[in-house]
Regions:
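His/Asp/Glu-rich metal-coordinating catalytic cores
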Residues: 1-172
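A short, hydrophobic C-terminal helix/tail in secreted or cell-surface proteins
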Residues: 174-176
């Protein structure tokens, strides 16, 4: 196994691979510029252009333009809303709206998300703290990703989640 730094390069026999910073709901997404004897292939995986990512770097639009200007034999990409007109919202937009909602409501709020969306998890923690709420993570994947994100230096300035057993219906009912 080889660890590749963000914006790093790897040489694999006839393939020169350059990592390009992208944005998405997962941490540190990268596109790959793969230089082959036949030409350059750009592989992005799933990605989106988020002008205000809350975690991680902004998309390296300058480098993507340079690659396009140099010429690309093929682009292999995936983007969930590619056929939807307009732009998808930023995670910052989600944070502002969730903070507004949580500030107005007085009772229990349940926020659901993909466990892999650490920025969304961080948004939920932030909004809970700003509105004087507690937060709990439910599900093995949520706990696993939370722990991994903390170990990698993310989610460092968040409130501690409470044990999910402490948020049972009967426990909360007594406090409503």
């Amino acid at each position: 196994m080889q660890i590749v730094e963000l914006n790093g390069n790897v040489l694999l026999e006839d393939f020169e691979i350059e990592y390009i910073t992208l944005t998405h709901s997962i941490l540190e997404p990268n596109g790959l510029r793969i230089k082959t004897p036949a030409g350059v292939v750009l592989h992005t995986g799933d990605w989106k252009v988020d002008p205000n990512p809350l975690i991680g770097d902004e998309i390296n639009a300058k480098r993507l333009k340079e690659i396009g200007d140099e010429g690309v034999l093929a682009m292999i990409c995936d983007s969930t809303n590619v056929f939807s007109a307009g732009r998808s919202g930023s995670e910052l937009d989600v944070r502002k709206n969730l903070l507004n909602i949580m500030g107005r409501l007085k009772k229990r709020i349940i926020v659901t998300s993909f466990a892999s969306n650490v920025a969304r998890m961080e948004t939920a923690f932030y909004c809970a703290e700003q509105t004087g709420r507690q937060i709990s993570l439910v599900g093995r994947s949520m706990h696993r990703i939370y722990k991994a994100a903390r170990q990698c230096g993310y989610l460092q300035n968040t409130i501690d989640p409470i044990d999910p057993r402490a948020v049972s219906y009967t426990h909360l009912r007594a406090h409503e």
